[in-house]
C-alpha cells in the first residue's frame, strides 16, 4: 500500500510539473511574435517553398499539444497553399481536410507559429508534387479524434512518411503524430529516417536519424535526440538546439532573397 501511495504521489507531482512547465513554455514562446515573419514573401522570393508549422492549440489542449500544418509555394507563384486537418469542420462537411491560399505563418487562435521545417529552391520544387499527392492520399479525412488520433498531427506525420525526403521531425507536443492503425503497427517513422512501432498512438517506440530515440506512452512523448544534443518532453517540448534556426533563414531576421537558391532544412539563404 505504501508503495502504491508513493507511486500515486509521484505521478501527481509529475503531472503538476508538466502543467506548470507547459504554461511557462507556452507563455515564453508566445512572447516571441513570429506570425508573419517566418515565410518569405512571394514578391521577394520567387523560388519554391515547403514549410511545416506548429502552434499551441486552443482550449485546455494547449497545455499538452500543438496543431501542425504544411504550406507550399510553387516556383514563381504569388500564393502559398496550406493544408491542415480541422476537426470541427466535420460538423458541417464530410471532410476535415482544409486547403486554402493564405499566409502560411499565421497565428493559430492567438498562439504564435513555430517553424519546424523549411525547404526552398530546386529541392522544394521537386517535392511539392509528392506532398500534394500525399495530401490527396490521406486516409482519415473523414475521421477525427483529438486523442489519441487521427488528428491534425496524424495528417502531418502521414505526409512525412509518404515523402521521406522532407526529413520531417515533429515535436513531442504533436500528440497524434504516432497514431497508427492496428494493421500497420510497425512502419517508417514520420521523418522517413527510422522505424516506429505504435499501437493507435497509445504506446510505442521510434528510432531514427531525425527523431533520435522516442518513447510514447498514452500519447505523451519522451525523446532523446543524440545528434542535435536535445531532449523533448511531454507538454514542454524541445530543450536544446532548434530544428530550424530562423535567424539564418527567414527574411524577417535576414536579408531578403530574390533568386532561387538551394536549401537546407534544409535551407541556406545568403
Regions inferred by a protein language model and the residue ranges of each:
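Bacterial N-terminal signal peptides
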Residues: 14-25
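A mature extracytoplasmic/lumenal domain signature
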Residues: 54-56, 76, 84-89, 113, ...
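N-terminal secretory signal peptides that target proteins for export/translocation
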Residues: 1-10
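Intrinsically disordered, low-complexity segments
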Residues: 8, 19-20, 261, 266
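Glycine-rich catalytic cores of cysteine/serine-nucleophile enzymes that process amide/ester linkages
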Residues: 30-38, 43-118, 141, 221-236
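Mid-length scaffold segments of soluble, non-membrane domains
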Residues: 103-164
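Activation targets extended, charge/polar-rich intrinsically disordered C-terminal tails
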Residues: 28-35, 137-270
Amino acid at each position: 500500500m505504501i508503495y502504491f501511495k508513493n507511486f500515486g504521489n509521484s505521478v501527481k507531482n509529475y503531472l503538476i510539473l508538466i502543467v506548470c512547465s507547459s504554461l511557462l513554455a507556452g507563455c515564453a514562446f508566445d512572447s516571441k511574435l513570429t506570425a508573419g515573419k517566418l515565410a518569405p514573401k512571394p514578391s521577394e522570393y520567387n523560388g519554391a517553398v515547403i514549410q511545416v508549422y506548429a502552434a499551441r492549440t486552443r482550449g485546455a489542449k494547449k497545455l499538452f499539444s500543438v496543431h501542425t500544418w504544411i504550406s507550399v509555394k510553387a516556383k514563381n507563384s504569388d500564393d502559398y497553399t496550406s493544408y491542415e486537418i480541422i476537426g470541427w469542420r466535420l460538423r458541417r462537411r464530410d471532410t476535415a481536410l482544409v486547403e486554402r491560399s493564405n499566409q502560411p505563418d499565421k497565428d493559430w487562435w492567438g498562439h504564435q507559429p513555430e517553424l519546424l521545417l523549411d525547404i526552398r529552391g530546386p529541392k522544394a520544387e521537386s517535392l511539392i508534387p509528392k506532398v500534394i499527392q500525399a495530401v490527396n492520399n490521406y486516409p482519415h479525412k473523414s475521421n477525427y479524434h483529438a486523442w489519441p488520433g487521427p488528428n491534425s498531427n496524424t495528417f502531418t506525420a502521414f505526409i512525412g512518411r509518404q515523402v521521406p525526403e522532407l526529413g520531417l521531425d515533429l515535436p513531442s507536443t504533436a500528440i497524434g503524430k504516432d497514431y497508427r492503425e492496428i494493421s500497420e503497427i510497425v512502419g517508417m517513422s514520420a521523418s522517413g529516417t527510422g522505424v516506429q512501432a505504435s499501437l493507435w498512438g497509445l504506446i510505442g517506440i521510434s528510432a531514427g536519424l531525425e527523431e533520435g530515440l522516442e518513447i510514447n506512452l498514452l500519447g505523451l512523448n519522451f525523446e532523446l535526440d543524440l545528434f542535435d544534443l536535445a531532449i523533448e518532453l511531454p507538454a514542454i517540448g524541445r530543450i536544446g538546439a532548434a530544428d530550424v534556426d530562423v535567424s539564418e533563414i527567414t527574411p524577417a531576421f535576414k536579408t531578403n532573397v530574390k533568386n532561387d537558391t538551394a536549401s537546407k532544412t534544409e535551407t541556406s539563404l545568403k
